[in-house]
Amino acid sequence: MDQGEDVLVKRTTIEKFSKTYYPDFENDGTRKYILTYDPASRLDNSVVLVAELFRDEEKGLMLKLVNMVNLVERAKDGTSMVIQKPKQMEIFKNMMVDYNLGYVDYEGIDSVFIDAGAGGGGFEVGQHLLTDFKGKDGRLHRGIIDPENEYMKLYKDDYPSADPILNLFSFKKDKTAAYEATQAMINQGLVIFPKGLNVRNELEFEVENPDGSMSIKYEKPGLDEINSITQMDLAKEELMGMQKTKKPNGTIVFEQTPAAKSNNLHDDWIQSTILVTL
């Protein structure tokens, strides 16, 4: 059953533009990616999304969601907690290295978007990314900078080697416009989503038989792949759980549907997804 007309993205739309494929965990030397990061310090989820940016002959530039990671860990008592910020930074920097494999810094990465809201310390994260760093490959890699940010551009002369691919975005300032832009891109079929796993945690590929008939080929992904696809499923659910509402004063806002609220959906996965379409 589909949702109402005011929903951000309908389930039928997500299903229409979903395909079966494995996540990407590194660049093969031919692709270009966008990374987004919605950091958290304590209670929320801290989500990183990776999308491949490519050009379709008919539609032009498109996005394909290829990996999503929630930077949380299990405490000794079994509760979920956000990984400490220094470790988060190390993981994110090494993801930048992975998705730039085969390229000079950072020709394999189109852009990096970070939610600069105060809650997750997004601006602080951006400051940590200014400095050159040694990656897990043992090599020194350039830092990155947002040259348009009113505060970060003050550091430009202090970090001359920083690559200007960083974008610090404030949802507080431009949330409605950002959500509407994402809605338009998805409805136009410019974003490809991964299909979810079946009940046995398998990927289902449609294959054509020699006689022209179609059948299903089942493949069992690894644990990291299962986790990635599961995280992207959560992003899809949050997209479908958001609706446009007009307040009495005429202001347009996007907020969770009553059903999403009753299911205790968050907004951490959707924020990273919104960022990737900016």
Residue ranges and their predicted role:
Residues I144-E204:
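Short alpha-helix plus adjacent loop in nuclease-associated cores
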Residues M1-K153, T176, E180, N201-L278:
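RNase H-like, metal-dependent nuclease domains and their acidic two-metal-ion catalytic environment used
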